[in-house]
């Protein structure tokens, strides 16, 4: 349970993500003692929690992960932005988010839905939130496995999971 999956640090705030897998719902509790220590030692530190989802069956597409569905079909679904999670309630993992100054780049995929991205947009009013997706990934989860900043003007992007051309403009302009 890497911290980067569960908690997001933006400025002086630590945000607990919703987590979208039922088996990972309680992971945030492991970090609470450390977060409490930071909170007690720094009067400017903010500790926030996104709304914890219920993670009912309505949050997931039935049989989406069936072994009967081949990779080609999954690639088509990824290109169409049709994922295992529905839009029932906000869902996101912190590991689907990269921060570039005032820009938050959020991967829409298996663990982060559009309602989760909207929640982040509303929560971080002083930041620009950008949704991205990587059509070449049949199981899109956690942005740093696909896309990693190295320095201004340079990113590493997995060649099998390319950022669509229309989404590259943000990075080319900056």
Spell out what each predicted region is.
Residues 1-174:
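The feature marks the mature, well-folded catalytic cores of soluble enzymes
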């Amino acid at each position: 349970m890497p911290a980067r999956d569960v908690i997001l640090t933006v400025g002086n705030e630590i945000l607990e993500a919703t987590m979208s897998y039922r088996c990972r719902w309680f992971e945030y509790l492991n970090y609470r003692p450390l977060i409490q220590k930071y909170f007690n030692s720094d009067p400017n530190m903010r500790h926030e929690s996104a709304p914890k989802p219920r993670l009912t069956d309505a949050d997931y597409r039935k049989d989406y992960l069936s072994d009967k569905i081949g990779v080609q079909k999954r690639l088509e679904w990824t290109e169409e932005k049709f994922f295992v999670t529905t839009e029932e309630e906000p869902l996101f993992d912190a590991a689907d988010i990269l921060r570039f100054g005032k820009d938050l780049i959020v991967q829409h995929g298996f663990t982060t839905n559009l309602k989760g991205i909207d929640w982040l947009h509303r929560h971080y009013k002083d930041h620009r939130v950008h949704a991205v997706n990587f059509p070449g990934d049949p199981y899109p989860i956690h942005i740093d496995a696909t896309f990693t900043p190295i320095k201004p003007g340079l990113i590493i992007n997995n060649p099998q999971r390319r950022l669509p051309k229309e989404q590259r403009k943000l990075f080319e302009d900056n």
